């Protein structure tokens, strides 16, 4: 009978000879490609309807069936089963906003029936132009305020020049008036008594 020490040694040798289990390799996750920013978005059903009506150029309006055919022919990847319900919502939205209008021939129609035309949408770019105008006015007001501040100095200089010009011509007039006042009484006082004395001596 083999001793128990030998059995333990044989077991340890068998364990050492057995190949080591390699650790399970972790599966590498393939990185997802980021979606390109600003990718091509699918147009809305209302925009597709407007494009179909403008392309067909029918004065009396385009029917719902003709619009549907044009959308399916010119737009790929559209689910035909959901297109009918999407068109109904788009027609209702377009009539409320004024983008779509019914012609006189289909005035009594309702829902997604009859024919449709493109209406006149409210012009948005005009509002943007009006918003920019106050900036120009503010720059003009600044220039006017700067001119108003500078103008009083010019007026003061003009007033001083006018006063100096007005004072100069007054000085010779005063001297001339004094000279005439002095000369007139002397001539009358001296001449008058001499003539009367000569007449009395002759008698």
Curated annotation (Swiss-Prot):
GO molecular function, one term: DNA binding
Gene3D superfamilies: Winged helix-like DNA-binding domain superfamily/Winged helix DNA-binding domain (1.10.10.10)
PROSITE patterns, sorted: H15 (PS51504)
Gene Ontology BP annotations: cell differentiation; chromosome condensation; nucleosome assembly; spermatogenesis
Description of post-translational modifications: PL-II* and PL-IV are produced by post-translational cleavage of a common precursor.
Cellular-component GO terms for this entry: nucleosome; nucleus
Region (Disordered): 1-46, 104-203
Keyword field: Chromosome, Developmental protein, Differentiation, DNA condensation, DNA-binding, Nucleosome core, Nucleus, Spermatogenesis
InterPro entries: H1/H5 (IPR005819), Histone_H1/H5_H15 (IPR005818), WH-like_DNA-bd_sf (IPR036388), WH_DNA-bd_sf (IPR036390)
Tissue/organ expression: Sperm.
Name by which UniProt lists this protein: Sperm-specific protein PHI-2B/PHI-3
Biased composition annotated in UniProt, kind: Basic residues: 1-35, 126-140, 147-203
Job description of the protein: Linker histones are implicated in chromatin remodeling and/or transcriptional regulation during spermiogenesis, the process of spermatid maturation into spermatozoa. Protamines substitute for histones in the chromatin of sperm during the haploid phase of spermatogenesis. They compact sperm DNA into a highly condensed, stable and inactive complex.
Xref: SUPFAM superfamilies: Winged helix' DNA-binding domain (SSF46785)
Species name: Mytilus trossulus
A Pfam family assignment: Linker_histone
Compartmental location: Nucleus; Chromosome
Transmembrane parts of this sequence: none
């Amino acid at each position: 009978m083999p001793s128990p020490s030998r059995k333990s040694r044989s077991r340890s040798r068998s364990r050492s000879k057995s190949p080591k289990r390699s650790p399970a390799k972790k599966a590498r996750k393939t990185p997802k490609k980021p979606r390109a920013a600003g990718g091509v978005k699918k147009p809305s059903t209302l925009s597709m309807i407007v494009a179909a009506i403008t392309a067909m150029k029918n004065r009396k309006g385009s029917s719902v069936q003709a619009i549907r055919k044009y959308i399916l022919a010119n737009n790929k990847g559209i689910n035909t089963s959901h297109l009918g319900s999407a068109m109904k919502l788009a027609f209702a939205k377009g009539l409320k906003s004024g983008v779509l209008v019914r012609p006189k021939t289909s005035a009594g129609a309702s829902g997604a029936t009859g024919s449709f035309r493109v209406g006149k949408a409210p012009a948005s770019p005009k509002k943007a132009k009006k918003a920019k105008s106050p900036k120009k006015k503010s720059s003009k007001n600044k220039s006017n305020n700067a001119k108003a501040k500078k103008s009083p100095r010019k007026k003061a200089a003009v007033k001083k020049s006018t006063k100096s010009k007005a004072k100069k011509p007054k000085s010779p007039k005063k001297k001339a008036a004094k000279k005439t006042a002095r000369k007139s009484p002397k001539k009358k006082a001296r001449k008058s008594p001499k003539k009367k004395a000569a007449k009395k001596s002759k008698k």
